[in-house]
């Protein structure tokens, strides 16, 4: 019998216990491995689920192809997609980053997997074409730190739920179409350091809750329509560095609490409606680099405390109502580079302390009431590039060292009381590009006062006291395009070298004492568009070489001593719209060639010795508005064909030997009596108001036999007339009652016929109604922003008739707006430019209201570009001319009209092309006359895709709105289609940004020749400057037009 050994049993038990203790760690390891494997499996499953959710969202995009950046978004079977999918990053088994910026996506957020991506910390969907609204579900991503939906097409309001993003550091919603107010809940984002929601359509106030964002470093709210006052709480943000509230509708005062913002380097609040004084506490912002408060309604003095800001490099206070003197303390801003305080009401002298601004590059003091001499120290800065002092009351001499650094480019001194000689440093200042001395008392010998300027583009020395002869050295200023020396005391002959300045676009030597003859070599300046030599002592023949100046638009040779005939070859000036040869000794007949100047709008040949008859071919001058043939020896009749000259508004034929009836034309009917005096045999109708004798239809001598014959004929006729008169009387009595009823009905319905025409409006009204078949759709040729355009073939001309729509019609029927509208129409009918569609008049009747324009054969530029065959005919040369023509017209509207006219709707649909593809601006339905004493704030107008940001959002009308639209139009002409999103990209690019012409040019055209290509590239550079988001940084149309000339 076996008995168990107790000791053995104990030892066996001890062994098992020991073994069990050794196996416990191994079991834990196994459990841990199993746990890790399971968790990884779950993580892969979770990550794949998130990826599938993104794939489902991608499937809703409307434009994804195999070549798109998202073509890598396939097969999420494993977590490897985290490294292979474009724009996706993962951590700890979950997607945390989604960066799809600039991937060309077209879609919405309706199907975004909000509930499937709980760990997102970074979302960048900017620079795409997302549309629709921002979902409030974005507020669920509590871990989100970076959120960017900028540069899309999002609409609607900013959801208040975004205030729940408690970890958010950066919020960017830039350049969308978001509207409504900024939700106050944004003030709960206590960790946010940057908020950028500029360039939207936001309204309402800036929330005072922004004062809670104590970590905020940068706040960008510019280019919206925000209103109300600026919350003083913003002044309590200790970490704020950049604050941009510009281009809104903010009102009220600048908070004095801004003095607490010790770290702010950039403060932009320009182009608002801020009022009151600039708080002196701004001087406590000692870190400021840029302070821009221009274009507001600020009053009071410039605070002297600004001098405390030693770091300030840019100070823009222009276009306000600041008064008082310039504080000397501004001279203590030793870092100042750009100081602009123009267009205020500042008085007193320029402080001597400005001599301490040794880093100054730009100084703008123009359009104030400043006085006294310019302190010599103003020229101490060797970096001085732009100095604008015009339109003040400055006196004395210019500082001798005004071009000390040799970098001065722009010097504007117009309309002051400067005197004395031109400083030697200016004579030797090779850097000059633009110089204006107009309207002062500068003196000295013109031949010695100026040197050679290799970069000079424009110089105006008019209305001064310069004397002496012109120097031949001007020929060496080879970039000079505008040379204006009128109203001085210049003598001698014009040097022959002047006629070698082939780059000249404008030459004005008028009102001097210049003598000699004009040579045939005048034909060398074949780029000239404006030639003014009037008011001198020039003699001899008018050179026939003028016929070669085919770019000439304006010619004034009046008040000289030219003799002999008018050159018959002057008919070869296709662009000429103004010709004045009056007050000379010209003789012989008026050459037939003048009647071929189809663009001519003003012709003055008065006070000469011209004889012969007036040609009936004058009727060819359908654009002629003013004609003066007075004080000559003209004879014969005024041709009856003058009745067909529909544009004619002013005529003077006095003091000639003319006879016979005056033509049946409104210009003749409305002319004053002195327009016909001195012509003893001129006669008019019985109802004439010009004091002319009635025209007789019988001769003064008749034989007795003839008289008897007449009696035999007249007696029965008179009898018949009496009988007919009785019948007519009965009929008239019957009609009188009917007419009274009709007139009563008309008066009740406001049925007036109101017209502004350069011809008989009532007659034309009936003709137009008939020609358009009472506006039958078969005559419809286009639709504009304010009505439909019809083709009307009248007896003597084809016209375009724009019938205003009911909305526009009802608005102008309001008595409070009618007169303003009619005043604008009158102003527009006076526009005289070859690149502006002529507006003949306006007619308002209870049934129809319409505008009458000249007819353009090829229709709109947009239609031409949309048609492949037509677009190919519009070759590079023609496209260049289109751009230049529009530029010249806008320059005329902005700078040659008083008040200036802003079109506000420059687009390819409003550029019409004639038979020869010459471009003309049309549709002034939204035009605004910039009257100096009126507000320039107006409702939004214009065509989508062409509207300047400040007009679309801030509704501020300036000429720079047209400049922006011109930039878009120029790109469209080059590209052959609207540039679309390229515009917004270029608007935010630096002004010197370059583009590959090949990448954006119209591929329907062959590649341009090297010469043409260079010109197109120059035009492209101008377009980029026009698209600058800051209106003040855009060029003027005058500078563009001059450059194109």
Curated annotation (Swiss-Prot):
Record's catalysed reaction(s): L-seryl-[protein] + ATP = O-phospho-L-seryl-[protein] + ADP + H(+); L-threonyl-[protein] + ATP = O-phospho-L-threonyl-[protein] + ADP + H(+)
Keywords: ATP-binding, Cell membrane, Glycoprotein, Jasmonic acid signaling pathway, Kinase, Leucine-rich repeat, Membrane, Nucleotide-binding, Phosphoprotein, Plant defense, Receptor, Repeat, Serine/threonine-protein kinase, Signal, Transferase, Transmembrane, Transmembrane helix
Induction cue: Induced by pathogen elicitors flg22 and elf18.
One GO term of the biological process aspect: response to molecule of bacterial origin
Record EC number: 2.7.11.1
Domain Protein kinase: 775-1045
Highest taxon in the source lineage: Eukaryota
InterPro entries named in the record: Kinase-like_dom_sf (IPR011009), Leu-rich_rpt (IPR001611), Leu-rich_rpt_typical-subtyp (IPR003591), LRR_dom_sf (IPR032675), LRR_N_plant-typ (IPR013210), LRR_R13L4/SHOC2-like (IPR055414), Prot_kinase_dom (IPR000719), Protein_kinase_ATP_BS (IPR017441)
Residue numbers carrying Phosphothreonine: 772
MF (Gene Ontology): ATP binding; peptide binding; peptide receptor activity; protein serine kinase activity; protein serine/threonine kinase activity
PROSITE patterns reported for this sequence: LRR, PROTEIN_KINASE_ATP, PROTEIN_KINASE_DOM, PROTEIN_KINASE_TYR
Glycosylation sites noted in the Swiss-Prot or TrEMBL record: 63, 77, 99, 119, 179, 212, 249, 263, 284, 323, 380, 393, 410, 487, 500, 580, 633, 687
Residues where Phosphotyrosine is found: 853, 892, 946, 953
An example Gene Ontology CC term for this record: plasmodesma
Function of the protein: Acts as a receptor of SCOOP peptides from Brassicaceae plants regulating multiple processing including plant growth, development and stress responses. Perception of SCOOP peptides induces the association of MIK2 with the coreceptors BAK1/SERK3 and SERK4 and relays the signaling through the activation of receptor-like cytosolic kinases (RLCKs) BIK1 and PBL1. Also able to detect SCOOP-like proteins (SCOOPL) present in fungal Fusarium spp.
Protein name from the UniProt record: MDIS1-interacting receptor like kinase 2
């Amino acid at each position: 019998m076996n008995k168990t050994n107790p000791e053995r049993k104990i030892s066996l038990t001890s062994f098992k216990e020991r073994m069990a203790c050794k196996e416990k760690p191994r079991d834990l390891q196994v459990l841990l491995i199993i746990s890790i494997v399971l968790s990884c499996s779950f993580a892969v499953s979770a990550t794949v689920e998130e990826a599938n959710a993104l794939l489902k969202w991608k499937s809703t995009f409307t434009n994804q192809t195999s070549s798109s950046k998202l073509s890598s978004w396939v097969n999420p079977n494993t977590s490897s997609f985290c490294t292979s999918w474009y724009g996706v990053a993962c951590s700890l088994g979950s997607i945390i980053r989604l960066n799809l910026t600039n991937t060309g996506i077209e879609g919405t957020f309706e199907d975004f997997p909000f509930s499937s991506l709980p760990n997102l910390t970074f979302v960048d969907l900017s620079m795409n074409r997302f549309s629709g609204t921002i979902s409030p579900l974005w507020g669920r991503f509590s871990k989100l730190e970076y959120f960017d939906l900028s540069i899309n097409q999002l609409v609607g309001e900013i959801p208040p739920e975004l205030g729940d993003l408690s970890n958010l550091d950066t919020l960017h919603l830039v350049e969308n179409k978001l509207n409504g107010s900024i939700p106050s809940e944004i003030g709960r984002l206590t960790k946010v350091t940057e908020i950028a929601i500029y360039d939207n359509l936001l309204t309402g106030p800036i929330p005072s809750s922004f004062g809670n964002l104590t970590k905020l470093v940068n706040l960008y709210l510019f280019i919206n329509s925000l209103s109300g006052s600026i919350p003083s709480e913003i002044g309590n943000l200790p970490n704020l560095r950049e604050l941009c509230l510009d281009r809104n509708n903010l009102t009220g005062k600048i908070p004095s609490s801004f003095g607490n913002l010790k770290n702010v380097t950039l403060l932009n609040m320009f182009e608002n409606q801020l009022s009151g004084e600039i708080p002196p506490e701004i001087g406590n912002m000692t870190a400021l680099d840029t302070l821009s408060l221009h274009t507001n309604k600020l009053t009071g003095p410039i605070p002297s405390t600004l001098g405390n800001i030693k770091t300030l490099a840019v100070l823009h206070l222009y276009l306000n109502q600041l008064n008082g003197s310039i504080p000397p303390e501004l001279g203590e801003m030793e870092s100042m580079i750009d100081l602009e305080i123009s267009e205020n009401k500042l008085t007193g002298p320029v402080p001597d302390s400005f001599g301490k601004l040794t880093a100054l590059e730009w100084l703008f003091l123009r359009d104030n009431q400043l006085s006294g001499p310019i302190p010599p120290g103003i020229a101490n800065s060797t970096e001085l590039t732009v100095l604008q002092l015009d339109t003040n009351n400055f006196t004395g001499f210019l500082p001798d060292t005004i071009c000390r650094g040799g970098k001065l480019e722009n010097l504007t001194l117009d309309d002051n009381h400067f005197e004395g000689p031109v400083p030697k440093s200016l004579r030797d200042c090779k850097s000059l590009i633009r110089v204006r001395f107009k309207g002062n008392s500068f003196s000295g010998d013109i031949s010695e006062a100026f040197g050679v300027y290799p970069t000079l583009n424009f110089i105006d020395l008019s209305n001064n006291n310069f004397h002496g002869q012109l120097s031949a050295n001007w020929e060496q200023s080879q970039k000079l395009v505008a040379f204006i020396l009128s109203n001085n005391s210049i003598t001698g002959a014009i040097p022959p070298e002047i006629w070698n300045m082939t780059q000249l676009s404008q030459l004005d030597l008028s009102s001097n004492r210049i003598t000699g003859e004009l040579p045939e070599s005048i034909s060398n300046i074949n780029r000239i568009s404006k030639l003014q030599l009037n008011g001198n002592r020039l003699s001899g023949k008018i050179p026939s070489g003028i016929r070669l100046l085919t770019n000439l638009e304006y010619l004034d040779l009046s008040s000289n001593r030219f003799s002999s005939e008018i050159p018959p070859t002057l008919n070869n000036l296709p662009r000429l719209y103004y010709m004045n040869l009056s007050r000379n000794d010209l003789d012989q007949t008026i050459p037939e060639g003048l009647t071929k100047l189809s663009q001519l709008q003003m012709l003055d040949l008065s006070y000469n010795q011209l004889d012969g008859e007036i040609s009936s071919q004058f009727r060819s001058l359908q654009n002629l508005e003013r004609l003066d043939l007075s004080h000559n020896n003209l004879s014969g009749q005024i041709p009856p064909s003058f009745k067909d000259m529909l544009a004619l508004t002013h005529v003077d034929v006095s003091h000639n030997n003319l006879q016979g009836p005056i033509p049946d034309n409104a210009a003749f009917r409305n002319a004053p009596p002195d327009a016909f005096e001195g012509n003893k045999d001129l006669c008019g109708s019985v109802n004439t108001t010009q004091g002319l004798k009635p025209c007789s239809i019988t001769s003064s001598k008749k034989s007795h036999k003839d008289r008897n014959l007449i009696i035999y004929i007249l007696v029965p006729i008179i009898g018949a007339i009496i009988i007919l008169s009785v019948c007519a009387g009965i009929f008239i009595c019957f009609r009188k009652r009917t007419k009274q009823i009709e007139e009563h009905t008309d008066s009740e319905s406001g049925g007036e016929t109101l017209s502004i025409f350069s011809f008989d409006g009532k007659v034309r009204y009936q003709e137009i109604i008939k020609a358009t078949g009472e506006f039958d759709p078969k005559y419809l040729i286009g639709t504009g922003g304010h009505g439909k355009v019809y083709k009307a073939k009248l007896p003597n001309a084809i016209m375009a008739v724009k019938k205003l729509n009911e909305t526009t019609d009802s608005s102008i029927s309001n008595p409070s707006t009618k007169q303003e509208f009619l005043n604008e129409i009158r102003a527009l009918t006076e526009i005289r430019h070859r690149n502006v569609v002529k507006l003949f008049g306006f007619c308002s009747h209870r049934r129809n209201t319409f505008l009458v324009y000249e007819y353009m054969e090829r229709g709109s530029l947009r239609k031409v570009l949309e048609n492949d065959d037509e677009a190919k005919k519009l070759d590079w040369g023609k496209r260049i001319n289109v751009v230049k023509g529009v530029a010249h017209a806008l320059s005329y509207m902005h700078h040659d009209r008083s008040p200036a006219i802003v079109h506000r709707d420059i687009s390819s649909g409003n550029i019409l092309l004639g038979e020869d593809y010459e471009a003309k601006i049309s549709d002034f339905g939204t035009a605004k006359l910039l009257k100096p004493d009126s507000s320039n704030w107006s409702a939004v107008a214009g065509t989508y895709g062409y509207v300047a940001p400040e007009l679309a959002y801030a509704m501020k009308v300036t000429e720079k709105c047209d400049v922006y639209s011109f930039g878009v139009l120029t790109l469209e002409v080059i590209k052959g289609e609207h540039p679309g999103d390229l515009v917004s990209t270029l608007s935010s690019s630096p002004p010197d940004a370059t583009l590959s012409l090949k990448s954006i040019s119209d591929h329907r055209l062959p590649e341009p020749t090297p010469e043409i290509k260079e010109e197109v590239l120059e035009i492209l550079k101008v377009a980029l400057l026009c698209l600058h988001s800051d209106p003040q940084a855009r060029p003027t149309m005058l500078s563009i037009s001059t450059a194109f000339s």
